């Protein structure tokens, strides 16, 4: 999506400061980073398991790429060295299918977020696909997402949307926003 409206709407909803530390987990070559830079955000980190995807985004951004911190890592194993105000995860969390991976990831998120930070997670819903790019995923409902995160985060809002893929397929996502307690 050239303009990831759902994700950008969260930034507006929470009135995220242009100097806030933002991390995009699984950002790869998505256009969120382009939009963040265009909107004047100054502390952006993009993490993805695929160096090739990050390289594609860097090439697309040209000189602007130097304004972004790029991290090649598996979200399940990532151990940040700084704290974030806004943690964005669109379609990385659902690849964590083992309970131990999910628990480790949630621990990392809560340890790496500033007090009252905002967490956005978008995954395939229980009405969405069971696989992504041929890989098994874990589907979520509002209830199951909240149950995973309620120890450290207060739910602000959840909703489902249909995403149309480039091939024309419809994928149902659930997006939830949380505030760190």
Where do the PLM segments sit?
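Class I (Rossmann-like) S-adenosyl-L-methionine-dependent methyltransferase catalytic domain
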Residues: 1-82, 96-108, 118-181
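Conserved acidic residues
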Residues: 85
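A conserved beta-strand element that flanks and buttresses the S-adenosyl-L-methionine
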Residues: 88
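Short catalytic micro-motifs in class I SAM-dependent methyltransferases
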Residues: 91-95
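Short, conserved loop/helix-junction motifs that constitute active-site signature segments
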Residues: 111-114
